[in-house]
Amino acid sequence: VRTQSPLLRHINDSPEIWREMWRKQVDLSCIPYYMFVARDTGAKHYFEIPLEKCWDIFRKAYSQVSGICRTVRGPSMSDEPGKIQLLGVAEIKGEKVFVLRFIQGRNPKWVDMPFFAAYDPKATWFSELRPAFGKDYFFFEHEFPTRPMYGDGFLFE
């Protein structure tokens, strides 16, 4: 049995909760699989957590568990182009960026390819991110014919 759970503000938004949950899952012979970012639907404003904090919670929890718990991937977002994992925050060429990758993508060639979004401390979902380094589009967007402006909801129609 593989496990997955959303990361929700007011419910499980601390590394300690995730660390203990993953350990308990392994004790029960379950395999930690995904930590999901709360989807941008419903009561979004109550449950949402900025992406950098999601990554920080994941990183801190992950660093406190043994290898048998480190089967988990996250924080991830299931969006129109695929399942996107936030790998971290970095500074590249003087620009603070989010480092991302596709765990699964509409095009298999996208899988496991790192890409970068401009850092936004308020962003809570992929559709709120812009490409880094002054680019107009993420590398995969040429395969989609339409897209609303950033921050206007869904990235793809």
Specify the residue positions occupied by each region the protein language model found:
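Auxiliary Fe-S-binding modules of radical SAM enzymes
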Residues: 26, 31-35, 39-157
